[in-house]
Amino acid sequence: MKLLYCLLLVILALVGLSSGAKPSDKLQIGVKYRPDECTVKTKSGDKLKIHYTGTLLNGDKFDSSVDRGTPFEFKIGVGQVIKGWDQGVLGMCVGEKRKLIIPPSLGYGQQGAGDKIPGNSHLIFDVELIGIN
């Protein structure tokens, strides 16, 4: 009986994956690594140093501070970055790593950005908080 139940779950999962389901229209935040000790978490108004790699859903990389060897610096919560970043890095600890899946409404919307990010693109960012000032 357990085998039949497990087989049914696997079949349902495969059907869901192969259906070409539309990505979520909500920000998705996955914690990949969190330090054991965290005395300070990011909050609105903090100036952050972050390493990131940005890709589209198809895996095409469009930008990476890691490749440049220089962390990106910005002030959180004041509109210096896309809304998905402002929301997605709140509450992070130095050393923490997250995966952000950002819908178009919190990214670059219908217009896209340059020639590397088409309009209505979901964005995937692997981010690591390097420092808080």
From Swiss-Prot:
Gene3D superfamilies: 3.10.50.40. Keywords: Isomerase, Rotamase, Signal. One of its GO terms (molecular function) is peptidyl-prolyl cis-trans isomerase activity. Residues 45-133 form the PPIase FKBP-type domain. It catalyses: [protein]-peptidylproline (omega=180) = [protein]-peptidylproline (omega=0). One of its GO terms (cellular component) is endoplasmic reticulum. Residues 1-20 form the signal peptide. Its EC number is 5.2.1.8. Pfam families: FKBP_C. It is an enzyme of class 5 (isomerase). Transmembrane segments: none annotated. PROSITE patterns: FKBP_PPIASE. Belongs to the FKBP-type PPIase family. PPIases accelerate the folding of proteins by catalyzing the cis-trans isomerization of proline imidic peptide bonds in oligopeptides. This is FK506-binding protein 2. It comes from Dictyostelium discoideum.
